[in-house]
Swiss-Prot record:
It is found in: Cytoplasm. This is Ribosomal RNA large subunit methyltransferase H. GO terms for cellular component: cytoplasm. Specifically methylates the pseudouridine at position 1915 (m3Psi1915) in 23S rRNA. It comes from Heliobacterium modesticaldum (strain ATCC 51547 / Ice1). Its EC number is 2.1.1.177. Keywords: Cytoplasm, Methyltransferase, rRNA processing, S-adenosyl-L-methionine, Transferase. It comes from the Bacteria. It is an enzyme of class 2 (transferase).
Length: 161
């Protein structure tokens, strides 16, 4: 069984997102071992300088990496500049990760300014969910839905489209 750890910046606040996450966590229980770890975000000024932005991303990145824990994992950075994957691509990657290991996959979700270069450096893949921009809190729900869909594909089960 694949072990999935989602490490995200910021605390989920919206009730509708929390409810959606609970639903997919429940559904995924039959397919994988799942952990979601939230790390504190930094206060971002309205117009941060490049230096301020880099420092904020570095602090948040250090927290993400500490929360990721075990070094023996496949890191996946969720990044709008990453590679676009279809559902079938994700299902195939999940199948290979489970078969060939390491059996832990860590998905990194950055804060408002994105992920630090240090987080990107430990990631074997950079995945863009869409060319659209989503709030980083909504990305958690989209990610869980896609992981659930990938699990269903890998088991040959139907999923409403």
């Amino acid at each position: 069984m694949l072990h999935i750890r989602i490490v995200a910046v910021g605390k989920l606040k919206e009730k509708y997102l929390k409810e959606g996450l609970r639903e997919y966590i429940k559904r995924l229980g039959a397919y994988s071992r799942l952990e979601i770890i939230e790390v504190p975000d930094e206060k971002v000024p309205d117009k941060p300088s490049d230096t301020e932005a880099a420092l904020i991303k570095r602090k948040e990145g250090d927290r993400l990496l500490a929360a990721a824990g075990d070094k023996d994992y496949i890191g996946v950075a969720l990044d709008p500049r990453g590679e676009m994957w279809s559902t079938e691509d994700l299902a195939d990657k999940m199948r290979r990760w489970e078969l060939y290991g390491p059996n832990l996959v860590v998905f990194f979700i950055g804060g408002t300014l994105g992920l630090s270069k240090e987080v990107h450096a430990v990631c074997k893949a950079k995945w863009s969910l869409s060319r659209l921009t989503f709030p980083h809190q909504l990305v958690r729900l989209i990610l869980l839905e896609q992981v659930y869909r990938g699990c269903k594909v890998n088991r040959g089960e139907t999923y409403h489209r």
